[in-house]
Amino acid sequence: MTLPFAWRRGGLALAWGGVLGSLALAPVLAGAPVAVLVLPWVLSAVALGLPHGAVDPLVPFAMRGERLRLGPLAALSVAYLALGALVLAAWWTVPTAAAVGFLLLTWAHWGQGDVYALRALGWDAHLDGTAQRVLAGAVRGALPMVVPLAAHPEVYADVVGAMAAALRPDRAEAARQFVLDVPPWSVWVGLGVLVAAYTVWGAVIAWRRPGARRTLGLDLAEVGTLTAFFALLPPLWSVGVYFCLWHGLRHLARLAPLVADGSARRLALYAVPGTLGALALVGLVFAETLHQPVAGVGAYLVGIAALTGPHVVVVAWMDVRQRVWTGR
């Protein structure tokens, strides 16, 4: 089964360019002020990051080959916003639990996005069935979520605290301490076991299936490089770059053939209303904190969390329709 994926060479070049270019600048970025490190997040508000979910309400029509109709579109948009409002309510009532839930959901979702990319690029010959694809998603999603926690626990805790403080400043320290109570060594061990299991399973498949050796090598090359990327670079920078140039771009490459006939310009135009609406809502709810670098990123991430809930539902539905986890 051929899965749609636009801009294969250009998209890969841009993603890898962002990762390798950042690694080359690691000594400079290590001492960079916070105002510089948050620049990828500023960029994400208008390009690749936030816009990658802005056309979600159009996806069901495109995938079913239906004409866009105002009534169903309005209903989908209202449901989308209602689910986002429920997420914000969770951040108000139980901010620490909401932060943990958001991190776990992002782990699953970013892994989900990379599994689609592996399949669409034809890099999946070593992934033999649903269980191994789920493990691939767990490994890929762990890289941006778990490696920074193990390598930079203080910064990770500061960002989680800033997220909790976005709506409940009195809960910030509790959320921060929750992160600091996790021993970094245990995170490294858990990640090591996960990656080792994935590598061994892939090697067994590659041993039996010669065509899988190349794809396993490509997959593990990305896993190794991304591990170094998140371990060596400041998390504010690395996760922001990944959000834009890796995850966001790959999802847009998935959407372009479905929604915009492969046209980047048309897809960008379709994303404008949703992006502006999302920015307006984030600005309205978090106007007092967005101007502060770390606090602003925390507030922005809570806004993204509200959108991530319904976005994951849409992407999961796409996965089922396209048989990402079950098809050959």
PLM region spans:
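Membrane helical hairpin/interfacial module
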Residues: 32-95
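Hydrophobic alpha-helical transmembrane segments
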Residues: 175-197
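Membrane-interface helix-loop-helix junctions at boundaries between adjacent transmembrane segments
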Residues: 65, 69-71, 85-157, 161
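Membrane-interfacial helical/loop segments at transmembrane boundaries in membrane proteins
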Residues: 157-182
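A cytosolic-side transmembrane-helix exit/cap motif
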Residues: 58-66, 116-133, 257-268, 316-325
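Hydrophobic core segments of alpha-helical transmembrane domains in multi-pass membrane proteins
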Residues: 38-49, 96-108, 238-250, 300-304
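N-terminal signal-anchor module of multipass membrane proteins
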Residues: 1-51, 301-307, 312, 316-321, ...
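Predominantly late transmembrane helices and immediately cytosolic-facing juxtamembrane segments
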Residues: 113-119, 242-259
